[in-house]
Design a protein with these regions (language model features):
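Short, flexible, surface-exposed loop segments at domain boundaries
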Residues: 2-9, 20-70, 88-157, 168-205
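Hydrophobic h-region of N-terminal signal peptides that target proteins for export
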Residues: 14-20
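A short macromolecule-binding patch
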Residues: 71-81, 159-167
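Low-complexity "stalk/linker" and mucin-like segments enriched in Ser/Thr/Pro/Ala/Gly
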Residues: 83-86
Length: 205
């Protein structure tokens, strides 16, 4: 009798194990078959990297910056195409304004040397700490004007941030197009992928 109960118990356990395994496989299949958005797919591909921190050295057109971001230490190469900006208003600054000890955010190419520290072409160097009062560099991948014409929605080339820009942020918002480079000021972002925000101010560079 005891042997019969043991056999029955083992059979029941095996049945439950099989059923649980089948349910797990079914759930995995359902997850795998869910569509993956384009924004999520491109999270691993960064068109623009950034580091926020302090200038350690200035060597001709190369700024050595230590801080936080995609790289803790980076040598940013300033070219004729690099935007040198005041983070408070988006106005252009001279390279001489970027001195050792200044707080900056540098936006740079993912194409980097293998040296230590790595070197990369700087797209923009923004003077000021990385607070809400300091604008963020934004390369426009897509721009879509609302049907009622009251705002434009832009997504950056990293496809990590979608921003809504209206006439309060920029009076010529309707003229913003793909390929433009912007400075954006905003308070908060959603936790979605991509993140979303409403711009308080937008400057076309």
């Amino acid at each position: 009798m005891k042997m019969f109960k043991r056999v029955l118990l083992l059979a029941s356990c095996a049945t439950m194990l099989f059923a649980g395994s089948a349910m797990a496989n079914e759930n995995i299949k359902e997850v795998q078959e869910l569509p993956v958005t384009k924004a999520y797919q491109t999270q691993a591909v960064r068109d623009v990297l950034f580091t926020t921190g302090e200038i350690l050295e200035v060597n001709d057109n190369v700024l050595l910056i230590r801080g936080e971001g995609h790289h803790n230490l980076v040598a940013a190469v300033v070219t004729d195409n690099t935007y040198l900006l005041n983070g408070k208003n988006g106005k252009a600054k001279k390279l001489s304004s970027f001195k050792v000890g200044k707080e900056v955010t540098v936006y740079y190419s993912p194409k980097m040397t293998r040296s230590i520290p790595p070197q990369a072409e700087a797209y923009a160097v923004v003077l000021g700490d990385n607070s809400e009062k300091v604008g963020k560099f934004f390369k426009v991948e897509e721009a879509t004007l609302a049907e009622d014409g009251t705002y434009v929605t832009v997504i950056n080339t990293n496809e990590s941030l979608v921003a809504t820009i209206d006439k309060k942020a920029n009076k010529n918002f309707a003229e913003i197009k793909a390929g433009d480079n912007l400075m954006l000021w905003y308070d908060m972002m959603t936790m979605s992928l991509p993140a979303r925000t409403n711009a308080n101010k937008a400057v076309v560079l």
